[in-house]
Structure formats: C-alpha cells, structure tokens
Amino acid sequence: GETIEQAGRAGELCFAGATVFDGYLGTSNDGVFTADGYFRTGDLVEICGNPPHYYQIVGRCKDIINRGGMKISPTELDTLLEGYPGLVEAAVCSYPDEALGEKICACVVVEPNQPAPDLTAICSYLLKRGVAKFKLPERLEILDALPRNPMGKVVRAELQVIVRDALQKVRSGAHRT
C-alpha cells in the first residue's frame, strides 16, 4: 500500500519489526501481511493533529462500505445517528446492490413511547450535520436491539443478515419498512 503522512486521511494500520509474529498457526496467512512484510491489523486509522501526529482508530477495514466505488466509514454515521432525538442506539451496515455494489441501511432502536423516525427524517438530520449525499442510507430498519458481541460491540455481520432477511420479506411481499 501507500504510506499516508497527511492529517485527515485514513488507512489501514500496518507495522513490522523484530517482535511481530510470523503468522497464524494452522491457518492460511493470505492477506495477513503486505507484499513488503508489514502486518495488516485490519484497523482503520486516521492521522490527527499537527506534527507530531497521533493516530486515532476510526473503525475496521472489513466494515468499510463500498458504494459505487466511494468508501464510507460506518463509524462516522453511527456516531452522528446516536445523537438523533428519540433513539436509544443506532448503527449502519451495508447490503448488496447490483448497480452500486453496496448500499447503506441505518438500523435504529427507538426509545420507548417515542415515534419511529422515517428514512427522510434520518437523511435530513445527517445532511444538516454535513454528511455528503453519497453517504446517506437508502434503507431504515427499526429494531428492538442491536446485535452485540460479549464485549458489547455491535456485530455488523449480524446486522447485515437482519437487513438481508428484511429485504427478502419485502421482495416476497411479507414485510414493509
């Protein structure tokens, strides 16, 4: 890959050194190291501040949404949506699209006794906070809870399954969101 040296740009954190392991035991190590021997962490980091720079982890590379060639960090949208009035929690995930590769779905949990937002309201909220139009979700799923791992982190892969199941129901005429 390329070395990123300017603040505001994000890339995958890779490193090498005498104490870096040689690979995983008993499994394929394809893609674990770069061509020049750097270990690929899978963490997406952004360079921040003026020199000396510091690095901030902004997400996982596997979670990046590729919508028509545009790379979108779901973490940015998650953070903004968590401030939406009447929501307990929110996260976005991708779902397959023939034309664009992937589209974005906002998955939200609404506070008890609060009205559920609609997609137009969610998009308007995001636009007012400076989100580019290509990053806006095309779908909204209202959930009882977001799937989480034992550490409490949202499991996007499970969100994607929920969204795909909902899309299947829509296509079969059994569900509307």
Residue ranges and their predicted role:
Residues 32, 125, 162, 166:
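Residues that form generic nucleotide/phosphate-binding pockets
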Residues 1, 7, 33, 41, ...:
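Hydrophobic alpha-helical segments, especially N-terminal targeting/anchoring helices
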Residues 17, 22-23, 37, 44-135, ...:
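AMP-binding/adenylate-forming catalytic core of the ANL superfamily
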Residues 161-177:
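Acidic/polar alpha-helix N-cap and adjacent early helical turns
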Residues 2-36, 70-72:
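Conserved ATP/PPi-binding loop(s) of AMP-dependent carboxylate-activating enzymes
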Residues 1-2, 91:
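Glycine-rich, charged/polar anion/phosphate-binding loops
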